[in-house]
Each structure stands twice: as structure tokens, then as C-alpha cells.
Amino acid sequence: MAAEAAGGKYRSTVSKSKDPSGLLISVIRTLSTSDDVEDRENEKGRLEEAYEKCDRDLDELIVQHYTELTTAIRTYQSITERITNSRNKIKQVKENLLSCKMLLHCKRDELRKLWIEGIEHKHVLNLLDEIENIKQVPQKLEQCMASKHYLSATDMLVSAVESLEGPLLQVEGLSDLRLELHSKKMNLHLVLIEELHRHLYIKSTSRVVQRNKEKGKMSSHGKDPSPGPLIDVSNIPTPRKFLDASQYSAAGGSSVREMNLQDVKEDLECDPEENSTLFMGILIQGLARLKKIPETVKAIKERLEQELKQIVKRSTTQVADSAYQRGESLTVDNQPRLLLELLELLFDKFNAVATAHSVVLGYLQDSVGTQLTQQEEIKLYDMADVWVKIQDVLQMLLTEYLDMKNTRTASEPSAQLSYASTGREFAAFFAKKKPQRPKNSLFKFESSSHAISMSAYLREQRRELYSRSGELQGGPDDNLIEGGGTKFVCKPGARNITVIFHPLLRFIQEIEHALGLGPAKQCPLREFLTVYIKSIFLNQVLAEINKEIEGVTKTSDPLKILANADTMKVLGVQRPLLQSTIIVEKTVQDLMNLMHDLSAYSDQFLNMVCVKLQEYKDTCSTAYRGIVQSEEKLVISASWAKDDDISRLLKSLPNWTNMAQPKQLRPKREEEEDFIRAAFGKESEVLIGNLGDKLIPPQDILRDVSDLKALANMHESLEWLAGRTKSAFSNLSTSQMLSPAQESHVNMDLPPVSEQIMQTLSELAKTFQDMADRCLLVLHLEVRVHCFHYLIPLAKEGNYAIVANVESMDYDPLVVKLNKDISAMEEAMSASLQQHKFQYIFEGLGHLISCILINGAQYFRRISESGIKKMCRNIFVLQQNLTNITMSREADLDFARQYYEMLYNTADELLNLVVDQGVKYTELEYIHALTLLHRSQTGVGDQTTQNTRLQRLKEIICEQAAIKQATKDKKITTV
């Protein structure tokens, strides 16, 4: 038990202490520190028991694991033997190596010599192989250059030159080859730069040309081949998209800037130019290996503007050739649409060039960022530089085509506003343009020997001319318009801006989008366009308009210059119009067209319209006053027309409203003749009452028929102008009120027109209509004033108390003059006014003359039977003249004649006549008749008797009125 306890103690001690040496030290410390021998013996006994226990346990374990232990011991013995053998072998090798070292040390000089000779021979062989390869470089280089595998050629040449200037520098036999390859290396970058420019400016744009040709073929198959605008401004799409990969890269090739410069690999089995993007990357990589990137960038910057100008020249020739092939002659047709075609082509080409530059610029940035160039701080160009040069070239082109230097305006009139007063060119402006029919040739000489030889010669000349550009077109250069060393597709002029403004504005938007400019910043081309239009074009248009209008309004008598028959026929008018009015209306239409063409400046053009119409209104007002004003005083007809009450009354009468309505549209009235007769009576009453018994002096009437004709022409012209301007302005206002669905069909919407301008335009149109109405009223009143002028003196100053003689058989001279004036007016008005207005002038005139003559009875001092006969003849001749004019019997003059025939009776007979025939005239008119009879006849009694007759007259009239009223009431009751 004690042994087991001791063993357990030591096992626990061992388990507590992982280190056996610690246990031994503990036991030794216990034995050495203990003073009692018994304790030591006890400790010793415990140790021995523990060791015995361990031996037993070990024996048991050995018995249990004998096989494994035996295998482990044998394996250990085998490993030990192998290690021992290896040590012995290593020892033997060391001894052998020491022996070899001693032997080699003895032969070291001979071995060193042989080793050096071997190295020298190997180097010589390598040099010989390299020399053989270098000798073949010129031939291989020529093959690579011919096949345009420039990257392989560059690598080959750079490697060869490095060898010749390095290891083979001392080889005298290679000096000529060294010079040759060095020279080729010095010039190779020029070839690469030239190829790069060819792809930048020719290959990139040739795709645009090819696409245009395909479009042209498609359109020629699907449309009428007759010459017409290739590009319709109204249907130009929204801003074009920049060239994408499908537009720029070759079929199956990589898209624009899809790869880095390091990824560019040259395939010797394929056409290197099949993929232009890849080919330009190869060129940049070759230039980088030649360390010519700075020279490349410099060349691109220096040649950029010149290359763009060459694109303009080639495009100009291309457009001219296209027009020539369509059978158009630029010098004859002078079509600005070809300029639009040219600009659209240039926009596409410049976009293609910009896209190509973005590719090249990306490659250049990659080359600068790598170790290919080994250059520091290489300053590249950017896309802003490209767009600036494109804008510069376009500015120069526009400067020429818009004739900003005014090289042509001094000698050539404006194509838009110039026309001769002869009328043919003037009428051509308003003529409807017939659609051009294709001109089918009857025969051609193209297959004759002369034509074949001439065509071959021209083709050879043009091939030589365009061999470098890669854009050989067909057609002679003679189709271009010469101008100061520059060739044009159309005649330069300021009006060309109207055709190209919207497409140019869209391209400017594309440029600003590409440059990332905000709304607050404009590109130079937009600034150029804005300055040109505001500072040059608008002023030039204003000057042209002023010159044209002043040419017809600043004459001595602008109201006498009429448009010719051709112009009237074209305009579809029945009566002559003032040439100045047509010029002004054409100017307004021209400005309205400009407003649509240059929609961004619509306010400026509308302001011009307002100013020109206001000026013309003032001109017409001045001319009107020059006719109707005499010595700071208006003639009576103009004064009455100006009077608001009289003019309002005249316009309220049915004859005025009937004039404004066609006869078939007038409302039908029962007893219309009585209604109109009542209106004539009201008009006559107002005019007679307004004038009174005053005599009209000659200076208060318009005696010159040409003045009346001028007023008639002014009326027709101003009314026509008012209608045309109202139509134009109504279309303008309507165009600003489109629904969203309609707006989607409008390409370039006009900006909203301010209400103030619209109000001004409407007021001007109304003013012209009011002036036209006033002219017509003056004519209407002037004819009637002439009647007053001649017929009032006839009663006041005429002698009708005459005896029967030859003199009594003649017409009164005043009546003859009045008839003459009326006939002259009729002749002038019939030629100058439309029929319904002519009728308005003369209808009702017989009623007025009848009223004047009847009212004039009170002014006769005395009248005899011969005087009555003469008066009746006067009335008859007036009636005859008016009947010939109005083509209707003037029954009102019968009424006047019957009034004077009534004076054949005595005073008492007159009263009996009233009783028998009823009341035909007013009480005042009967009183005037009785008074005149009392003055003219003898033995009719004194004043008392006369008063009795007048009283009897009143009674008769009252009785007749009562009878008439009773009859009327009876009719009503019966109904």
C-alpha cells in the first residue's frame, strides 16, 4: 500500500510538473534539507517503489506492443545505417573534389584560354547571323511598307538601327547599310504621320461620302428624278448623333476607343486598313517606338486647319459634281439649297473627323502614359482644339458665302427684294411656282468618239487632281461659280443665311454639347453667327427694305404709280393697286419668311414689320392729306368723313352693309326698295341739314379727277394690304397656340410673340382698313358735294323767270358741268373700284339730287313756265346721265320733275291737286311751292290770301293723313 501511495504521489508530482528535471531537483532538495535520517530513508523507499512500479508498467507495455516496438527499432537501425553510408559517400566525394581541384588548378591557364576562345567564336557567330538578318532588312522593310504593316516595319527598322549603331558599329562593311537604314528611320515617322492624316481626314470622311451616295441611289429609285431640294429645311431632324462605332469602324472591327494602345496588335495576314481605328493605333504605336510623339502632335496641330480647308474644297467639288450629274447649272440656277447640301455634308464630315481625332487622342494619351516614348511632359492637344479649328474653318466658309465683305452688294441687287417696275420680275415674285418637270433629253452625244475621248481626258485630269484625296468625283469644275480665287456652289449673298440657319444652329448645339459648355457660355461659332445676324444681316435687310420702299414712296406723287397688268393678274385682283402698297406687302411677307427662317430673331423682324407698316401708314396719311387738304383746311367731303357722327351714320345705312356682303348672302327684306329709299332719304336729310343753304366755294371740292382716282386706288390698295396683313398675323398667332401633339410635328417652333407686338400689328391692320374706309367715304361724299356745289347756285343765282326763247331751250350750264363731273368720276371710279363699291358711290345720288332740287325751290326769286320747262329738261338730262351710270331708272328724279311740273298750276289749282292726288311731298315742300307761285304769278292775291292758302294746305294735309291712317287701320282690322 505504501508503494502504491508513493507511486501515486510521484505520478501526481510528475503530472503537475511537465519537466522531469524539476522533479529530480525537488527530490534532491528534500533529501538535502531533511535532518532526520528516517525521513530520508522513507523518501528513498518511496522512490524505489516508484521505479519498480514504472518498470512493471514498462514491461507490460512492451509485451502489449512488442510487434510495433520491434518494427520501430528495425526501422531506426536501417535509417541509421543509411545515414552512415551517406556520410561515408560524401566524405569520398569531398576527397574526390579536392583531388579534382588540385588537378584543375594545375591546368587552369589552358582551360581559361579555351573558354575564352569558345565565347569569342559564339559571339562571332551571333554577329554573323545578325549581319545576315540586317542585310535582309531593306527588302523586308520595303515589303512591310508596301503592304502597310507599319508596326512590323518600325520594329524591324528600330532594331536594325540599334544593332548597327551598337554592336555592329565597328563593322566597316555595314557603313552604307547603316546610313541607308538611319535615313529611313529618320523619314519613317513622316510616312506614318502622312498615313495618320490620311485616315483622319480622308478615310474617315470617305465613309460619309459613301453613305450619301447610297442614300442618293435609294432616293433616286424611290422618287421622281426631277431636280429638287436634296434637303428640306422644314424636315431636318433633331440634332444628329455623333458617329458611333457602327458608323466609324469597319465591319466586324472594334468600335471607337474600345481597346488600349497596349492591346493593339498587328495581324500580318489581314488588310491593315480594314479597321481604321486599329490602323491608327498601329500608327501611333509605331510613332511611339520611333519616339516621334512630340513631332506627331506638332504636325497634327499645324496641319489641322489646312486639312479641314481641303475637306471644304473636296466637298464643294463633290456637291457641284452631284448637281452637274443631276443636270443642274450653278451659274444659271443659283440655288442656295446647294449651300445647305454642302454644309450638311461638311457637318457629317467634321463629325467624322472629330471622332477620328478622339480615337487618336486616346492612343496618344496611352502612349504618353507608358514607357514607350520615354519622354516627359509631352503636351498633347485636346478635342477643344479640334472643335475650335472646325469652327474657324466654318466661319471662313460662312464669311465667303454670306458675302460679309460686301464684294457683291455694290454691283448686284438683292436677289430677294430687287425687281423692276416693268412688272415681269415683280409679278414673278407672286407667281405660283410650277413644279419642275424632269428634262428628258431626246438624244445624247456621250457615245460619240469625240465625247468618249473628251470624257476620258476630263476623267484623267480629275483623277490626277484628286488622286491624293481619295475622293474622285465625276463632272467638270466649270460647274462651280468663280469668285476671287474661290469656287462656290451658289452665289454668295446675305440671304443664304435663311437656308442654312436652322441646320447651322443644330450643329452649333452639337459642338457645345461636345465641349460641355453650359447655357451661360457660347462657342465661338454661335457668337460669330449672333454678331453677323445682329450687326450685319439685320442692318442689311433693313437697308434693302428701306431702299425698295423709298424707291416708290419718295417720288413726287406715290399715289399715281400703279402696278401693271401682269402683277394684277398674278395677285388675282380686279382693280389696280398702288405699287408702293404691293412693295410694302411684299416686304412684310419677306420679313415674315425671314422670321420663320431665323426663328431666334422673330422679335427683331416683327419690330421691322411694325416700323415699316407704321412708316407706310404715315406716308399714306401724308399723301391723303395732300389730296383732301387745301390751305390748311380739309375739303368738305373729307371733313364730313372725319366727322364721327356722319361717318357712323353712313356706315350704319344698309347700302354700306350691303357693300360688305355679296348680294346672295344679304338677308332678304320685304319691301327692300322702300327700305333702301328710306335710307337714302335719311342720308340726304343729314347732308342737306349739315350743309344748310351755304354755297360751296370751288376750293372746297376736289376738281381734279386724278385726285379722286388716287383716293380710289388708295382705298383698294389699303383694303388689300389690311386683308393680307391680317391673314399673315392670324397665321402667326395661330402658330403659337399649337397643341402638344401638333408641336411634335413642328421642327423649329417660333418663340412666343409678345402680346404688345401682336396688339401693335392688329392695330396697324385695323388702321389701314379704317383709312381705306375713309377714302371710300370721301369718294361717296365728294360726288354728293359736287351736286351741292352746282345745284344750290342754280336755284339761288339762276334766272328762271324767262320768256320762251332759244335760251330757254338750253340746259343750265351748271347742270352741264355737274353732268360732266359725274361722267368723269364715273369713268375714273369704274376703272379703279370694284363693282359693288362703284355702286355704293352712285346709288342714292338721284335721290339726293331730287332733294336738292326740290329744296332749292325756296331760293328761286320767280319762275316762269319757260323756267319750269328748262328745269324739267335739267332734271331729265341728269336722270338720263345717272341712268346710264347705275343702269336703273332714277325714279327719284321723276319725283323732282313732277314737283316742278306741279308749278304749272295756279296756287288754288295746286291745293285742289293735293286733294285729288293725295299728299306726295312734305308740308314744307308744298309751302315752298305755294310761296314760289305767289312770287312768280300775278293776280294771286295779297299776303292774307296767301296765308289763307297755307292754312288750307295744312288742313288738307291733316285730312289726307287721317284718311290714310283710317285706311291703314281698316286693313289691319281686316287682316
Swiss-Prot record:
Residues 211-224 have a biased composition (Basic and acidic residues). One of its GO terms (biological process) is mitotic cytokinesis. InterPro entries: Sec8/EXOC4, Sec8_exocyst_N, Sec8_M. It is found in: Midbody, Midbody ring; Cell projection; Cytoplasm, Cytoskeleton, Microtubule organizing center, Centrosome. The modification Phosphothreonine is found at T238. GO terms for cellular component: centrosome; exocyst; Flemming body; growth cone membrane; microvillus; myelin sheath abaxonal region; neuron projection; plasma membrane. Its main location: other. Keywords: Acetylation, Cell projection, Coiled coil, Cytoplasm, Cytoskeleton, Exocytosis, Phosphoprotein, Protein transport, Transport. The modification N-acetylalanine is found at A2. Residues 211-230 are annotated as: Disordered. It comes from the Eukaryota. Residues 32-114 form a coiled coil. Expressed in the striatum (at protein level). The modification N6-acetyllysine is found at K9. GO terms for molecular function: PDZ domain binding. The modification Phosphoserine is found at S32, S226, S469. Component of the exocyst complex involved in the docking of exocytic vesicles with fusion sites on the plasma membrane. Belongs to the SEC8 family. The exocyst complex is composed of EXOC1, EXOC2, EXOC3, EXOC4, EXOC5, EXOC6, EXOC7 and EXOC8. Interacts with BIRC6/bruce. Interacts with MYRIP. Interacts with SH3BP1; required for the localization of both SH3BP1 and the exocyst to the leading edge of migrating cells. Interacts with SLC6A9. This is Exocyst complex component 4. It comes from Mus musculus (Mouse). The gene is Exoc4.
